[in-house]
Amino acid sequence: MKTVLMVAEKPSLAQSIAKILSRGNMSSHKGLNGACSVHKYTGTFAGQPVHFKMTSVCGHVMTLDFLGKYNKWDKVDPAELFSQAPTEKKEANPKLNMVKFLQVEGRGCDYVVLWLDCDKEGENICFEVLDAVLPVMNNAHNGEKTVFRARFSSITDTDICNAMTRLSEPDHNEALSVDARQELDLRIGCAFTRFQTKYFQGKYGDLDSSLISFGPCQTPTLGFCVERHDKIQSFKPETYWVLQAKVHTDKEESLLLDWDRVRVFDWEIAQMFLNMTKLEKEAWVEATSRKEKAKQRPLALNTVEMLRVASSALGMGPQHAMQIAERLYTQGYISYPRTETTHYPENFDLKGSLRQQANHPYWADSVKQLLAEGINRPRKGHDAGDHPPITPMKSATEAELGGDAWRLYEYITRHFIATVSHDCKYLQSTISFRIGPEHFTCMGKTVISPGFTEIMPWQSVPLEESLPTCQKGDTFTVGEVKMLEKQTSPPDYLTEAELITLMEKHGIGTDASIPVHINNICQRNYVTVESGRRLKPTNLGIVLVHGYYKIDAELVLPTIRSAVEKQLNLIAQGKADYHQVLGHTLDIFKRKFHYFVDSIAGMDELMEVSFSPLAATGKPLSRCGKCHRFMKYIQAKPSRLHCSHCDETYTLPQNGTIKLYKELRCPLDDFELVLWSSGSRGKSYPLCPYCYNHPPFRDMKKGMGCNECTHPTCQHSLSMLGIGQCVECENGVLVLDPTSGPKWKVACNTCNVVAHCFENAHRVRVSADTCNTCEAALLDVDFNKAKSPLPGNETQHTGCIFCDPVFQELVELKHAASCHPMHRGGPGRRQGRGRGRGRRPPGKPNPRRPKDKMSALAAYFV
């Protein structure tokens, strides 16, 4: 029998689809990468019996990046990134080994059916999958079609089975539009980001951002936030005056009346009107009206509206809301959550979707009433031609989902029910009064039929007292007329919901990328999220936007990105040439980049006002090896050391604490060592600031601390403190942390493995001797006599932490969130692989300390 390979976008989706198509009769096993499962079953395809293999990827298989040497910031002019720097497709997550996994599963298959998400990104992933599997599949006979695309909008039996019977082809134009967007964002973003990051971090010490990034979508998004901030700052409150009248009915009921003039900004004029009315005793009814009005039911739900409500009503950030929606979709609770459409298709089964909710404990009564009376025809919205609106696909309870997932599901379901409910109808009563020469009005609303507000109570018409019955010519007693002094108020900072609306209006980003752009400006420390999910720009965000406006406003205005998005959509529709759009857009931004570089002094003037130069920032910490003066430690991101005398800046490890290391000095350059620590339970290691930035040996790279330094005699180096190969990763070496006592630690110098050992020992030292079994360095341990774990109250022991049974009970391995005793091999580990420094995969360097240290040192300088 022939074999059909089917590929979904996520492992959970693959399992759900396979379960539906196989009717639960399938076998499953983990793939070679450990992340994706393979589900097998037999069935029919193209009228013949076949073997089906259903598996998945984990999002994008490949990512776009520059060739190796162009990723070195210090050696490449950012201007070269626009055209001269070649790009290549790399595996998005090398640890998953996705290409090899797809090739193994695709080898010998005859057909491939692509079940990737039905959007532009999904089409792009289709071709990434095809690039991996087509070369290893069986050759087609007589031009037989072998590549198929399944299109679906929800994970339901009906939708999946229908998709399987209506297979089509992947859309190459949509995939190309994604390639174009990726390349534009990479080249433009990297060029501007590298230039401004290097320029400003080399001059200012309190920017508090490790990366001063620029993005064609990210920067206009920030621009909206700063524009609102500028309006708030430039706002000047004005005083105005309002007349307020209170009248009484015969039954002593009081009514507050609104002045028809609303307000006046001249006190004398307001006082004149007050004088003309305050002595009047009666208010005359000049007109009454009663009108029936309707509040429209909502349009069908699309992504942007869902994100707006999630932020404003549920308090969820757009990124978080989108992640929850995707999880609900993959679990089959809602339809595909990325859509711009607000109009149900003509063949959409509204009654069927509604019946699924008929027994729900929260809204069963409303649904049953709707089904009995007949559903209302939904409003005609916008049909973007992508996916149906977001709807619930099955009933779920709060106990079943819980937390934010339930809150979002509840809103989606209530919104769906509301779209097929009736409009809310209410009666609006208005009475017009005259007090002296001035006119006042009183309004009231009475609900006739709640309609959709019964299922969406937060949308209900505000309750107001009903107005008394009266007619033209009636009089009411004037209780008082007073003048109120008020002031105009500035607008508030943008909420996430308002920002999403602005981005949609100006065409910045897509329904899928809008949450990413908002999340980026938060992570870059350009804005902070205040109460009410309002976005307040930071000093850095404000200065950047003002600088862009000063140099080239189009870098921050939404117009140019909106035009680019339209061109990308034309590529997706097959109406524009990929290479022409790419070349034209890059040429425009290349010119803008050169002008930006030439005019950077304009932004620098703004930076000078808001931020402190490096020399005036930070606190003295360690001595420079060149001038022997104190260097200043700048704690703000990115943390670094700056010598104002030599005008040199040295980068440091991030996301930890830095302190002076016992005033010890590096034997190579005389710089004082500093100690980096990620916390009491994490890693820590000393480093030389100069060696960290300028590696002294050929086998070292920039960013290596003393725990990776191969100096043969330095007491802090890998050569003196290295023990043996890491138990988890291929290239790492476990190194003793000499600063960790009395709670001693051994940590890998590459991955996050930390072994806690020998608590309360007086002294731990790496011996020159090695283990006969695994060739790891032995440890000499001197225990506290009162707390010695050794038999016979002995205090000293020398052994191997991998092989010595005494030490094995005293060593606990930690990495990520797991911990376990450190044994060689063991369940779940790569059994059979040596843990010592003598057993290594072929081609791996041997990190043993050199026996002939002087020969080794000489070898470095030859």
Swiss-Prot record:
GO terms for biological process: chromosome segregation; DNA topological change. Residues 171-593 form the Topo IA-type catalytic domain. One of its GO terms (molecular function) is RNA topoisomerase activity. Residues 821-851 have a biased composition (Basic residues). Residues 820-855 are annotated as: Disordered. Its EC number is 5.6.2.1. The keyword Isomerase applies. The keyword Transmembrane helix does not apply. Keywords: DNA-binding, Isomerase, Topoisomerase. Residues 3-153 form the Toprim domain. GO terms for cellular component: condensed chromosome; DNA topoisomerase III-beta-TDRD3 complex; nucleus. Highly expressed in testis. The active site is at Y336. It catalyses: ATP-independent breakage of single-stranded DNA, followed by passage and rejoining. Belongs to the type IA topoisomerase family. Releases the supercoiling and torsional tension of DNA introduced during the DNA replication and transcription by transiently cleaving and rejoining one strand of the DNA duplex. Introduces a single-strand break via transesterification at a target site in duplex DNA. The scissile phosphodiester is attacked by the catalytic tyrosine of the enzyme, resulting in the formation of a DNA-(5'-phosphotyrosyl)-enzyme intermediate and the expulsion of a 3'-OH DNA strand. The free DNA strand than undergoes passage around the unbroken strand thus removing DNA supercoils. This is DNA topoisomerase 3-beta-1.
